[in-house]
Amino acid sequence: MKGQQKTAETEEGTVQIQEGAVATGEDPTSVAIASIQSAATFPDPNVKYVFRTENGGQVMYRVIQVSEGQLDGQTEGTGAISGYPATQSMTQAVIQGAFTSDDTVDTEGTAAETHYTYFPSTAVGDGAGGTTSGSTAAVVTTQGSEALLGQATPPGTGQFFVMMSPQEVLQGGSQRSIAPRTHPYSPKSAAPRTTRDEKRRAQHNEVERRRRDKINNWIVQLSKIIPDCSMESTKSGQSKGGILSKACDYIQELRQSNHRLSEELQGLDQLQLDNDVLRQQVEDLKNKNLLLRAQLRHHGLEVVIKNDSN
């Protein structure tokens, strides 16, 4: 947003600018900052000043003072500036309005034109056109900001304002130090994509080749173990699928044989138990037979055992 203000010279010889109004175009919604008080305008018709906003934000400026003695003693191309304390600073909010091409002010002038910049304070008043009571808005003039940047401010002259971005203010003539990088920047020198792809493809092919070799070796081992599936038949045209199929059949046959053998083994164990019981019974009967024979001899009876050949 761009606005225009009028100035008035006080009795103390300090050049001050009263609260101004916003120049509006065809947009009726543009809101004025404050009413213009009757005062003499700038004697120089080339004097221009603008409100500059970034990203549609609010304009903030600080109350400063330009002494008459400093203005009389300065040469063309320089400007002496002193600042008020932070407690005397004021804020003013500016509402953005639409401007036509006729209302715009050309801010890019020659080196002889005087430009004005409003510097921000720490707070912004609520509402459009809200100002702090009893404070006035002052303007900073400059003719050559590049020349002022290289000069140090004499002691006791207060703050030093630079005509650039409102956030960039150098105090006491000291230069602002730039924070170093946390880590040095190293540009990436990546190899061409084709070389990277070829390397990845070659590595993938090598892995696949090793995997195929392992599978082939395992199939050869199976062909040696499975009956009727020797290397000769494999070389004569036996496919890998046929070898694997025979391996599956052979494994199924082995499982069935193992199950059958386990059942037969359980039957043998049962027969062994039965045989042990029968053997014990035979031993008991033999002992009883011997006792009976002894009793018969004791009573004078002779026992004759006849073997029937029939």
From Swiss-Prot:
Domain bHLH, first and last residues per copy: 199-254
Biased composition regions of type Basic and acidic residues, renumbered to the chain: 194-209
UniProt cross-link Glycyl lysine isopeptide (Lys-Gly) (interchain with G-Cter in SUMO2), position: 306
Highest taxon in the source lineage: Eukaryota
Entries under SUPFAM superfamilies matching the protein: HLH, helix-loop-helix DNA-binding domain (SSF47459)
Biased composition (Polar residues): 1-17
Keywords: DNA-binding, Isopeptide bond, Nucleus, Transcription, Transcription regulation, Ubl conjugation
Main location: nucleus
Annotated region described as Disordered, given as residue ranges: 1-26, 171-209
Region spans: Leucine-zipper: 271-292
Protein purpose: Transcription factor that binds to a symmetrical DNA sequence (E-boxes) (5'-CACGTG-3') that is found in a variety of viral and cellular promoters. Regulates the expression of the surfactant protein-A (SP-A) gene.
Binding partners and assembly: Efficient DNA binding requires dimerization with another bHLH protein. Binds DNA as a homodimer or a heterodimer (USF1/USF2).
The protein's name in its UniProt record: Upstream stimulatory factor 1
Native source species: Oryctolagus cuniculus
